[in-house]
Design a protein with these regions (language model features):
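A short, exposed loop/beta-hairpin motif centered on an aromatic-Gly-Thr core
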Residues: 129-139
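A short, charged, amphipathic alpha-helix used as a generic interaction element across diverse proteins
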Residues: 137-153
Length: 160
C-alpha cells in the first residue's frame, strides 16, 4: 500500500477520512461519506481492499507518504485523528502514555500497594523494563514522585 493508491480512494479533512472512490458499483453511495466505523478498541477502522485498516494510519500515510510502525494519539483520544494529534513514535514511547489499567486501586499511574512493606510502591517503565522508584507511606507523595519520574524518563510522552 502506498500514498498514491490510498489518495485514489480517500480524502481526509479535520481528522476524518472520506471515500473519494469505491471499487464496487453498488457502493457508489459511499462516495463523499466518512469512511469506517468505531471499533471496540476505540479506534476508527475502515475495510478496504479486503483488509481492515486503522483510519489514523491511513491519514498519516496520506499526509506524510509513509506508514511508521507506531503512531501515537498525543492527547490519548483514539478517535481524534487530526494531523496535529498524530506523531510517529517507538513502541516504548507509545506505551508510556497508554491509559491507566482498569484494575488500578491507587488511582495513581504506576503506584500500587506493597503488602509486605505496608507502603505504596512506585514503578516506571523505562525501555520496556520496570524501574523501581521507591516506597512511600503516603499515597499523595507516591503519586507526586511517580508523576515526576514519568516526566523525567518519558519526557513529552509522559501521561499524567
Amino acid at each position: 500500500m502506498n500514498q498514491q493508491l490510498v489518495a485514489e480512494y480517500f480524502d481526509h479533512k479535520d481528522g476524518r477520512l472520506y471515500w473519494k472512490k469505491v471499487a464496487h458499483p453498488n457502493k457508489q453511495y459511499l462516495v463523499g461519506q466518512e469512511a469506517g466505523s468505531i471499533h471496540a478498541t476505540g479506534y476508527r477502522h475502515v475495510t478496504w481492499q479486503g483488509k481492515v485498516h486503522k483510519v489514523h494510519r491511513l491519514i498519516f500515510l496520506l499526509e506524510h507518504g509513509y506508514m511508521p510502525k507506531e503512531i501515537d494519539h498525543i492527547n490519548g483520544d483514539r478517535q481524534d485523528n487530526r494531523l496535529e494529534n498524530l506523531r510517529e513514535v517507538t513502541r516504548s514511547q507509545n506505551q508510556y502514555n497508554k491509559p491507566m489499567c482498569k484494575n488500578n486501586t491507587s488511582g495513581s499511574r504506576g503506584v500500587s500497594w506493597h503488602k509486605a512493606s505496608k507502603a505504596w510502591v512506585v514503578r516506571v517503565s523505562v525501555n520496556q523494563k520496570s524501574r523501581l522508584i521507591g516506597y512511600f507511606k503516603d499515597l499523595e507523595l507516591a503519586d507526586l514522585v511517580g508523576t515526576m519520574a514519568r516526566e523525567k524518563y518519558h519526557g513529552q510522552y509522559a501521561h499524567s
